[in-house]
Amino acid sequence: MKFLEFLGKRPPAAAPGPAPAPASAATASERGHAAEDLALAHLQAAGLQLVARNYRTPGRGGGEIDLVLRERDRTLVFVEVRNRSHGAFGGAGGSIGATKQRRIIFAAQHYLRRLPAPPPCRFDVVLVQEQEPVQWIKAAFEAQ
């Protein structure tokens, strides 16, 4: 399913009010949540189970992990969801540089310290770009 189609199928707000804005007028936050919803649906259809969503480290300067999922073999998968409206400047994947990777790795290390025995894990990226199918990049980067 393509992102704009998915965004258009989101359920309306429970409170009565004006009609939902068309996909093109959605706020950045709404588009981000819709992209995460679409990525999650894609990963769950592949058999992964949601463990956490929008995990944030406490304090300033930390990181956030969009989705934490578990595979059938118990591998913990930290997922960064990237959303872009077009392919300019590298598209959805073009904004995952070294700084962003370090923040995700930092957040994952913080998350893993809470567990009694850290399982195998990896870092995936799901790219959601308007008018394109969802792209899932397994093991997109590694903790150094």
Swiss-Prot record:
Ranges where the record places region Disordered: 11-31
Give this protein's Gene Ontology molecular function annotations: nucleic acid binding
> A single Pfam family, by name?
UPF0102
Identify the NCBIfam families for this entry: PRK12497.1-3, YraN family protein
Family recorded in the similarity comment:
Belongs to the UPF0102 family.
Name this protein carries in UniProt: UPF0102 protein Veis_0630
This chain's source organism reads Verminephrobacter eiseniae (strain EF01-2)
